């Protein structure tokens, strides 16, 4: 039994080491050492699928999931905690990500309905990469149903989402597409949720369209006591069961 226990602990140690050994700067290297140089030299965005230096972003096909894409800045922004995201001159990355959703349909071979799409960014402690990236991917069926059921309960003020999502507490706020286009969700979170501006890195944030064509912003806060790493990506299903 002692030997078995030792082997188990050894195996766990190997797993932990392997996870920690993953390079947290892979995305940054792809953007600054591959996509941007290749575009500047050859007008070829590869390995990204789109490079927009003037608009300040690139789009990359993620290796996880058949339809998941990442939108990333062409400046050095580590994540949601970066003060640049609250600067009015910074691109509205969430709205740019929404406009980039068409890459999913092109990859899929036919139009993907907007209700099936979600945008997310993870908290500082809930992410694996240290270059800002918004996940453009399918929403999970369970989350889609829960948001549909809460449609009438979500208003223009941040308020707790009834029942939470995936066992974690979330705040929800309704916005119109015009509001989403004009004002960054990062700014809305920082200015409207008490004390959020002091600890933006603790939050995961998501954007989903509702059946009435409004959008819902979803924010979850890091809480080790409830095992919530504030990985808003948890609302997504990168295998896209919602399309089957």
Curated annotation (Swiss-Prot):
Q: Which domain of life is it from?
A: Bacteria
Q: Name one GO biological process term.
A: CDP-diacylglycerol catabolic process
Q: Topology relative to the membrane, per the entry?
A: Single-pass membrane protein
Membrane-spanning parts: 7-23
**The entry's keywords:** Cell inner membrane, Cell membrane, Hydrolase, Lipid biosynthesis, Lipid metabolism, Membrane, Phospholipid biosynthesis, Phospholipid metabolism, Transmembrane, Transmembrane helix
Protein location: Cell inner membrane
GO CC annotations, alphabetized: plasma membrane
EC class name? hydrolase
Broad class of where this protein is predominantly found: membrane
Task: Please list the reactions this protein catalyses.
Answer: a CDP-1,2-diacyl-sn-glycerol + H2O = a 1,2-diacyl-sn-glycero-3-phosphate + CMP + 2 H(+)
The entry lists its GO molecular-function terms as:
CDP-diacylglycerol diphosphatase activity
* HAMAP family linked: Cdh
For this chain, the family text in UniProt reads: Belongs to the Cdh family.
Name of the protein in its database record = CDP-diacylglycerol pyrophosphatase
The organism encoding this protein is Helicobacter pylori (strain J99 / ATCC 700824) (Campylobacter pylori J99)
């Amino acid at each position: 039994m002692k030997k078995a226990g030792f082997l188990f602990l050894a195996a766990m140690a190997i797993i932990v080491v392997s996870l920690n050994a993953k390079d947290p700067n892979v995305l940054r290297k792809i953007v600054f050492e591959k996509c941007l140089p290749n575009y500047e030299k050859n007008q070829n965005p590869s390995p990204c699928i789109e490079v927009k230096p003037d608009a300040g972003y690139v789009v990359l096909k993620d290796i996880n999931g058949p339809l998941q894409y990442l939108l990333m800045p062409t400046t050095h922004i580590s994540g949601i905690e970066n003060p640049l995201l609250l600067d009015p001159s910074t691109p509205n990355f969430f709205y740019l990500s929404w406009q980039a959703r068409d890459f999913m349909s092109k990859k899929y071979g036919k139009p993907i309905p907007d209700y099936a799409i979600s945008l997310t960014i993870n908290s500082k402690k809930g992410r694996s990469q240290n270059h800002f990236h918004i996940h453009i991917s399918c929403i999970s069926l369970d989350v889609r149903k829960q948001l549909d059921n809460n449609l009438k309960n979500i208003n223009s003020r941040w308020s707790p989402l009834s029942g939470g999502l995936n066992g974690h507490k979330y705040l929800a706020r309704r916005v119109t597409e015009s509001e989403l286009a004009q004002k960054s969700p990062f700014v809305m979170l920082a200015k409207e949720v008490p004390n959020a501006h002091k600890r933006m890195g603790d939050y995961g944030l998501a954007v989903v369209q509702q059946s009435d064509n409004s959008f819902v912003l979803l924010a979850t806060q890091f809480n080790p006591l409830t095992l919530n790493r504030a990985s808003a990506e948890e609302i997504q299903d990168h295998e896209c069961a919602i399309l089957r």
